[in-house]
Amino acid sequence: MKKVVVTGGCGFIGSNLINYLLKKNYFVINVDKLSYSANIYNLKNINTSKYVFVKTDINDKKIISRILKKYKPSVIYNLAAETHVDRSIDSPEPFLHSNIYGVFNILECMRYYNNKSKNKIKLIHVSTDEVYGDILDKSKRADENYPFKPSSPYAASKASADHLIKSYIRTFNFPAIISNCSNNYGPKQFPEKLIPKLILNILNNKPLPIYGKGLNSREWIHVEDHCRALEILSIKGKIGESYNIGSGKNLSNIELTKLLMKIMKNKLSTIPKKVRINFVKDRPGHDIRYALNSKKIQKKLKWKAFIKINEGLSETVDWYINNLEYFKSISKREYENRIGLKI
């Protein structure tokens, strides 16, 4: 039985990845410090002896080393990170702590373990398309050789970690693969992010806050397609390489909002009267367009995104409608200083 560690396993992508891996008969060790956006509820249906949860920070060297020594995993999927751009603008320090120093600690714990063990642990590091920054030319999409140009403290912290891992690959022949993924959506996402915020505001008869004129364009991928890609990287990915993971489907924020309103109108029969698009002051350094060239993983590893945006959004809306009690219990943790303005 293949043993793997998933850091940040109680978060959105991490919890979806754990459920995906358990269905594939992996033994999963979930490492999560349970920050504001994490929730054990995301894994409430797990009932198997092939799952272990360890509550700790990835910066805790002793506990991370103990986990590696005890369970001897073959792969670490690193998803533990601070990810909310608005929070990074108002308070950058936690992003450096988790996204840079936390990665450094994982690298050092793995390096020490691998130097003493015959069975080496492989790192699958989950990064973001935001490291590439603005891609204003609509005829271009960033491939893996595209220069980094991060705009926010969040993006800079992720780019820093990517560079740090690449230095370990070069200097120490470190067994790591980096993935840079586009915007994820799907069930279990914390409601400070755009799609769940829009869904819940519609359900709660609230206005829909959109930055600027809503023209910022993002590439959207369903979290299930992302999880499938991460497993493929752990099996067939080439050590030392980076892989972009994207759907190729871009929508502006205003297009996404109107599509969600249309989907929800079909499900609810009508949209509540107070639900309207409310353009709010743009955030500092807001990138206009992200777009990935994912041909490398498509051609070399035979992966592609299967879930279409309309289908995926419809399924996502259903999940949120059926889990409203969960969101009532965590609503006080939302970030309401920028796009989360109380309206």
Question: What are the language-model segments listed below?
Answer:
Residues 186, 190, 219-222:
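Active-site helix-initiating loop/hinge in glycosyltransferases
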Residues 63, 84, 94, 101, ...:
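Residue-level recognition of oxygen-bearing side chains
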Residues 124, 133-139, 173, 189, ...:
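Proline-centered turn/helix-capping motifs that create local helix->coil transitions or kinks
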